[in-house]
């Protein structure tokens, strides 16, 4: 409420308003000071005045554009001012040169000159207004007008724009002011309109400023009486508006231009004289391409409106003129026919005299309807002063009659009247256009005569348009007809029609026809002399008035048609065939297209993709849910999705080779160790299994070497110590006792995964964590844990079962024993299964040799790759890729070797014996690679596994 009271107090008194203005002034000055501080600070920081261009533009009185680059540089401004001091208009070439010289656009150069000219004219106009105001004050004080040459128009209104009788108001030197005659004032107008009529022209001629012109045009817009506006047009008001329009366009006064166009749209210009319309049309037509779109669009719309209006008015005038002419002709013929009927029908001379008068009248009508040339009318003196008349007016005024060239014979068709007029939107025809039209018409006539070979082949027959309509000639008309026989040779003689027994016959005649009334229907008979009207046993003849349409549009005489048909009937067949060949049409058969069977494309109904697409569509079921809460997160689940899918069935096939950590040993030592390992594995397989205690003692003294050999990582031992230990391994390799048995048991086989689960309970997937890295140091430490006899027994059963599964495929002799042993061990495994859950760590150790893939044993000694573990299901089909010799060796030493190992392990509870041959890196794969090298080469083409692992070896 307090704020509302303060607002009321501010606007309630003058003092409050002054206080408000003072406060706004203080705020404005404070903002200016802040802007000045910002500019000064920016100038100190950057060293450049940010308002330099604006200040220069203000000093030079240049209009600032929207962007800084729109401003002219000082050099360009100085040069343009020097050029403007010499001349105020430059050409396009000079504008381009200045633009290229100073780096400005041509539009900027043109705008500079236009702006400077506008400023100069404004100064001149202001000085004139001061003189006019001083003269007005002097006239009011003294009562005598002062004449000054400076008050004259720069572009005075043409004197011929005003009729002498229009008004006597003067605006030049030495003339006096007079009132408009009362007879020129339109009757029945209001007082305001009367005041407008009395004073408008005096004010229009005296006004020189655009502001005063705007006020006067607004006064014209307020007049709604059509008679007053027509009077304004008749007295020359359009020419004054035209002068103002040209001045406003030259000085780019857009507001004045728009108002003048509105006034022109308000005035009934269809009542204006042609000379006034010519002047205003030229001025408005120049505004069609004005640079401001609003003005150009208004000018185009105004011209279009005038074009339609004038075309409509001219059509109405033409129709009225034709109707009035037809009415006068019909009245004249009616009077003559009535006079003939009322006269004495027995006197033929009177009838002939009447017919003679009628023929003369008809000839007058025909001459009036003939071709219209550029005839001089009553107001031709005013038309000669037209600069450019209305297009529709020119269309009615300019008509061309074809003139036959001297020495040129008449063509096949008589020269007809050709009316060529400009269209409603084209310019008036010039003399060149008329001459071109004549030459074109003559060319077309000669071309048409060449295209018609039939008259030349026939001979005398020609098709000539009639020059005169049907008329009745008397005996007095015969001398002129006989005198003009040479001129009317080619004129067709009208045929006569005589109905006989109800049918009409067509007969040619040799002269003008005569009409004779007979008993019955009207008969027209040919005569060989001048026509005569004779009553024959019947009533007096009745002259039927000829209609104007029949005069204007004479029908084609039937004689030409009948004669042409008769001549063609008399022609021989060869002549007709010759004429037909001249007009023969060449027919061309379009090229055909034959379809090749190879282009056929099946519809795809029996394609394999149809079933795939059908199944794909079945997966997309349309489901309707009752509410938003019932919609699942992913409703587009396949309908045949497998429940509880086992990912272990999917084999893990690496896309690239696993990274390897190379040892610091030289390549020669690696090759040497490979050869030694191959020899050791070969000798160990042939010798009896005995443990190498010396090697075991050496390895137990160096646990780092054990870790390096098992994990594939380099140890901290020196190179010499490493070589010594390797020499011990070479010498002790043949004495190893249990390596051959474990090689068979620990061999790792890689093949495609089996889709069926294994029946071995030891491979039920308990030790997945241990399978991931079977040769880690953690697992090696775990081997020292004490194991009970039951655990060892369970482990031995698992090993027996695994070996028994690989033997029967290649050793039929041991088939029954292996089946019995496998069945017994399966029953014991079911009994011992609860205890195996408590010994998970030991079970992981037993599964290590089984789940190890071939990727971990690429190097024989000293380097172990980072093996990738696969599921136990992927090991079921691996035994099928090995030869019969391996399985026979394994079956011979399988039971005894593993029993010896189990006894050795049970004799040392808590510890596990270790030898190089029993090492995970020295498994059966190395020996198998040397023994079965030939078989691998032989089976490489059939087994994709060897083709795949060539790059791993």
Curated annotation (Swiss-Prot):
DNA-binding interval(s): 63-123
Subcellular location: Nucleus
InterPro entries: HD, Homeodomain-like_sf, TFIIS/LEDGF_dom_sf
Sequence repeat feature ranges: 498-502, 507-511, 516-520, 525-529, 534-538
Keyword Repeat: yes
Gene Ontology terms, MF aspect: DNA binding; DNA-binding transcription factor activity
Effect of a null allele: Plants show late flowering phenotype (mutants LD-1 and LD-3).
Chain intervals with Basic and acidic residues compositional bias: 608-623
Biased composition (Polar residues): 414-425, 733-742, 888-934, 942-953
SMART domains in UniProt: HOX
Any single GO CC term annotated in Swiss-Prot or TrEMBL for this entry: nucleus
Region (5 X 5 AA repeats of Q-P-V-N-G): 498-538
Effect of residue 923 to S: In strain: cv. St-0 and cv. Tsu-0
Tissue: Expressed in shoot apex, root apex, leaf primordia and floral buds.
Biased amino acid composition, Low complexity: 651-661, 869-884
Function comment: Seems to play a role in the regulation of flowering time in the autonomous flowering pathway by repressing FLOWERING LOCUS C expression.
Protein name: Homeobox protein LUMINIDEPENDENS
Gene that encodes the chain: LD
